[in-house]
From Swiss-Prot:
<feature type="region of interest" description="Disordered">
    <location>
        <begin position="204"/>
        <end position="232"/>
    </location>
</feature>
<dbReference type="GO" id="GO:0003677">
    <property type="term" value="F:DNA binding"/>
</dbReference>
<feature type="compositionally biased region" description="Low complexity">
    <location>
        <begin position="695"/>
        <end position="715"/>
    </location>
</feature>
<feature type="domain" description="DEUBAD">
    <location>
        <begin position="39"/>
        <end position="156"/>
    </location>
</feature>
<feature type="modified residue" description="Phosphoserine">
    <location>
        <position position="1291"/>
    </location>
</feature>
<dbReference type="GO" id="GO:0051726">
    <property type="term" value="P:regulation of cell cycle"/>
</dbReference>
<feature type="compositionally biased region" description="Low complexity">
    <location>
        <begin position="1019"/>
        <end position="1043"/>
    </location>
</feature>
<protein>
    <recommendedName>
        <fullName>Nuclear factor related to kappa-B-binding protein</fullName>
    </recommendedName>
</protein>
<dbReference type="GO" id="GO:0031011">
    <property type="term" value="C:Ino80 complex"/>
</dbReference>
<dbReference type="GO" id="GO:0045995">
    <property type="term" value="P:regulation of embryonic development"/>
</dbReference>
<feature type="cross-link" description="Glycyl lysine isopeptide (Lys-Gly) (interchain with G-Cter in SUMO2)">
    <location>
        <position position="469"/>
    </location>
</feature>
<keyword id="KW-0597">Phosphoprotein</keyword>
<dbReference type="InterPro" id="IPR025220">
    <property type="entry name" value="NFRKB_winged_dom"/>
</dbReference>
<comment type="subunit">
    <text>Component of the chromatin remodeling INO80 complex; specifically part of a complex module associated with the N-terminus of INO80. Interacts with UCHL5; NFRKB competes with ADRM1 for interaction with UCHL5.</text>
</comment>
<dbReference type="GO" id="GO:0045893">
    <property type="term" value="P:positive regulation of DNA-templated transcription"/>
</dbReference>
<feature type="cross-link" description="Glycyl lysine isopeptide (Lys-Gly) (interchain with G-Cter in SUMO2); alternate">
    <location>
        <position position="488"/>
    </location>
</feature>
<feature type="modified residue" description="Phosphoserine">
    <location>
        <position position="228"/>
    </location>
</feature>
Amino acid sequence: MDSLDHMLTDPLELGPCGDGHGTRIMEDCLLGGTRVSLPEDLLEDPEIFFDVVSLSTWQEVLSDSQREHLQQFLPQFPEDSAEQQNELILALFSGENFRFGNPLHIAQKLFRDGHFNPEVVKYRQLCFKSQYKRYLNSQQQYFHRLLKQILASRSDLLEMARRSGPALPFRQKRPSPSRTPEEREWRTQQRYLKVLREVKEECGDTALSSDEEDLSSWLPSSPARSPSPAVPLRVVPTLSTTDMKTADKVELGDSDLKIMLKKHHEKRKHQPDHPDLLTGDLTLNDIMTRVNAGRKGSLAALYDLAVLKKKVKEKEEKKKKKIKTIKSEAEDLAEPLSSTEGVAPLSQAPSPLAIPAIKEEPLEDLKPCLGINEISSSFFSLLLEILLLESQASLPMLEERVLDWQSSPASSLNSWFSAAPNWAELVLPALQYLAGESRAVPSSFSPFVEFKEKTQQWKLLGQSQDNEKELAALFQLWLETKDQAFCKQENEDSSDATTPVPRVRTDYVVRPSTGEEKRVFQEQERYRYSQPHKAFTFRMHGFESVVGPVKGVFDKETSLNKAREHSLLRSDRPAYVTILSLVRDAAARLPNGEGTRAEICELLKDSQFLAPDVTSTQVNTVVSGALDRLHYEKDPCVKYDIGRKLWIYLHRDRSEEEFERIHQAQAAAAKARKALQQKPKPPSKVKSSSKESSIKVLSSGPSEQSQMSLSDSSMPPTPVTPVTPTTPALPAIPISPPPVSAVNKSGPSTVSEPAKSSSGVLLVSSPTMPHLGTMLSPASSQTAPSSQAAARVVSHSGSAGLSQVRVVAQPSLPAVPQQSGGPAQTLPQMPAGPQIRVPATATQTKVVPQTVMATVPVKAQTTAATVQRPGPGQTGLTVTSLPATASPVSKPATSSPGTSAPSASTAAVIQNVTGQNIIKQVAITGQLGVKPQTGNSIPLTATNFRIQGKDVLRLPPSSITTDAKGQTVLRITPDMMATLAKSQVTTVKLTQDLFGTGGNTTGKGISATLHVTSNPVHAADSPAKASSASAPSSTPTGTTVVKVTPDLKPTEASSSAFRLMPALGVSVADQKGKSTVASSEAKPAATIRIVQGLGVMPPKAGQTITVATHAKQGASVASGSGTVHTSAVSLPSMNAAVSKTVAVASGAASTPISISTGAPTVRQVPVSTTVVSTSQAGKLPTRITVPLSVISQPMKGKSVVTAPIIKGNLGANLSGLGRNIILTTMPAGTKLIAGNKPVSFLTAQQLQQLQQQGQATQVRIQTVPASHLQQGTASGSSKAVSTVVVTTAPSPKQAPEQQ
């Protein structure tokens, strides 16, 4: 190219352009790596280009050296190369074709299109590189797949050769076609479009979105339409040219339609304003007309759909006139067309007179051959087959197809053809019957077709081939009832054959009511809902409207529950007033029993139960949903008329008597159904009507009875909230008159003036705990001196469940000398041992002496309950369960003042004091897993007591279930126990070293006492704290210290199985009143004693109950020593056959009481308690623990770690407030759970809400003067203290005697 450089770089002499007469426009071109500038006219104008690049230029302009240089780029020939190159040059410049065009012409097009522009050349090179890389990658993938296929094929061949001999032929597996990503993407797009189309059809939306107009959005054919074989071309006369285009049914596939769309898009791009391509003025009806006309493939496509019926009738008349002249010709044509091979061409040319007949009549008779089976099992099958072929069809189209079928000769071969003269008139009733819109359909009927209101077309649901027998049976049923239905339709002025006649005809039109009309209606509505169990007649606007009773209300005594909250209804309405009942009344008030949804909404707005700020949109939305629900009821009261677009009230012909008769039948059916669902209860169980166990007061007179609902005969009874001063719920066992017991006086009393009684409650339940195994070494027991705190003990026994023992300690009872001569079993003094101190958040407060009531379930061994009176340094409450010991005790016969029956008051007051006196509950929960082993030690593997402070474990709703007996079951899982461990709690571990020295394990029991002290304790104040391994290094001032000390009790050698129970529920309340003997340093303390020894005890000749009060010196670090009052109660087992009731009154001194019994029953005594300590935390209200019995799980082997199940009868409403509500301080926003499940949490605000709603009439908040609460203080305060008082006052009922 060096010889051509001067030609390419020197400017061309184009004239006097340099003088300003013209301007050159040059363009850069990249030719083989050389960048040149060429005039733009040379590149764009072909004439200029070929004038420059021509044969004359080659011969005259170029020199010999230049021509030789250019000839090097020409092909080299072996012979006569120079001559052949010259011939090639001549052919090149003359424009001859070189198989793929002339290179000069191709170069001119490339210059003109800008392919030699430097930027274009650069990107073309990059594109070529990318394509080459893609090619290499595809080759690698191809060879990789090929290699895998070869290896797999080789392994298959080797395996086949190994299994079979060489004589057997090999069967090659054809590999399944792999799904490429492009194919998967296409299939995904098709699936998406199919789902989108079905959703749009379901919603009735026909508008096209922007993505549906894309090329890839063409939808496939409907899946409900089976692919029919290609229809052969019909034979028509050659002279009939007008019908050729519509007579042949064109089958277009997806590919054809996509090509058509692509061409349309191309035309729109090039000619956007062309009138034939503008689709903005097209409507959906136009498209439907075109699609339906082309789909039918008949002559009706040329006519307007509006006059289709008229044309069909004209064809019918024409057939009747010409049927004789063309009958033979039609039969000749029908026979060959019925075969699949088609029709032979006509050999004779038709005469001019026969042309009209041949042109029209054979075509009419051939219509039924197009996809319709002329012989069907029923008319319903014929209709469904037409719908299956058409996918969707309008009513005129279906009538036309049925008319064509009826005019065919083969239609008369059907056995049911003669049942109706004109089947085309029965198309609409048959479709309505198949859609389930007729009243004559069976109850188990499922619709076969549905009507699309948006498109006004009928659509097939499912496949009819699978239901031929069912369709035939339905068709026979329909034939029997259609005559009556159509007679009714002719008499009525309605399109629906099942619509009843209105009772009263009126010409009233629904309009907004005036104030007077609304007032009159609301007065009638108020009277109507005052007796919801009866029918009612509204008399408005000059006509009457009868409405039936409210659904589900069968008597006048309606439920006292509050109505469910609704955004559109008032909250103070009756519970049975719902949107459904109001809409039912509004539909009944429609004039003539029919109207639109807007009219129903207008009538509904007159109701007094609607909220005042309800908008018309909200009413319309709610009425729409309510009408749908009423439409699908078992006995529907409304129905939608598709043709007239009206809602019809179906019960408009019923009277009040008929309504009430149907309502009574429904009530009887509901009662019978409820009776079948309820399982019969065992005869040993008695259930109270109010879901609360009835509580009776024991007296010294005639015997009274108590009853209680038991979940199982082997389970302890479910105690209810104790009602002071009555006894807890007991099994229905006759109770003998209470004998008199002697009271031993064992020490002086420090209480010199009776105090006002305000009993706290000790709620004791029995959770599941494993056995402890053998006993420890013996230890000497000591009897501690005690001062008298009078106790009244009442004991029962029964065979159906566990007995209950109530211990009430009151300092106001006088002392009685002991009358028994037998020895008394008292609570021994605990020996010194290792102690564990657990600080809790509590400070010193001034708490008055307390009255403690304990409820303990009793089984077959002795249980001791110790109540310690408060002293300066400690508030003691000890509940001890001891093994039974044989002791010869005589039965006392003397009476005492304590034998009188308590008062019949049924109010239980649990006071939680704010301000300076706050009762704080610390719940102790946990499990003890023990494996019995031989030796002198007790291996406590999982002995963890968790002391829970202010936090309360929230139970998930899934843990509250109802068993088969109708009782609420609260399941505590190990996960919930783990949740307790994550809280801010302190763990007290009872280890092996805690229980003293080893020894003989066959005759000793074990007890652990937790002492809760309210005063400050420092590290150097008590020697017991030094032995505590788990206590914190420092104890803050004002904390409560929990001390755990071991205590050994003697037991029987034969008692080998024992069960240790954790603390569950004890609460203590302050006692109101004044006391003269108390100091400002007197502090109450709570002590919990958990004793092993609750095992299966053998029968003994006699058992002993000992109530002893003795004085014990309490450790007072800050204020010096003081006296602690302790009451020890030992409870024996009773014989089930001999019921005994003991009422004991003790004076101010220690008085042991002994009771002898007969042969005891072998039972177990589960014991559980809860610590209640005092603190200054001013949060209100505190927690009230629900008394629920804890059922023991069956033991599996010798090592048991099971989760306890708490069962109790929880009321369906909040009338039994004390049984199913836990009062605790919760954060704002805590929801109140009502219903069958117990309310878990309740704040003071929610308690007030309950009162306002009428759900908790037995709850009140009182303000108690502080003078009633400062019972042990030297100087009383007149400051009022707010107190929460929760009372439950069920009326005591006489329990029936259990047989």
